[in-house]
Amino acid sequence: MLSGLLLLAGCGNPVQRKLEGRWLGESVENFDAKEVAAATGWARGLSLEFAGSRLTVAVPAEEPRTGKYKVASVRENDVQLAVTRADGAVDTTNLKLDDERSIRFMIGDTRAVVLRREQ
């Protein structure tokens, strides 16, 4: 049993493998009509890059930030990540895995930024 657990630990989390790569913001969902244009502009400047256990987040008008992340929980296609910042603080973020080419970065319970895998 222990050897099986060690083998699984060495393989990495299956969700982590699905996230691997660079994701680019494309659009937004469930924003008020008056916010859609600005939110879409911001979303198109957003990128998430997953490399091993590292996550780099780039947002418009800010320097990219990199931290170590782990998959905190998975429920169907809902994934919660725990991301450790350079100062040691831990942030959580929620994603919805739509398919191998599309994820949604959740903002609250209903709003989302849709990201597509970089080709």
Language-model-detected regions and their locations in the chain:
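Beta-sheet ligand-binding and adhesion/scaffold domains
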Residues: N77-Q119
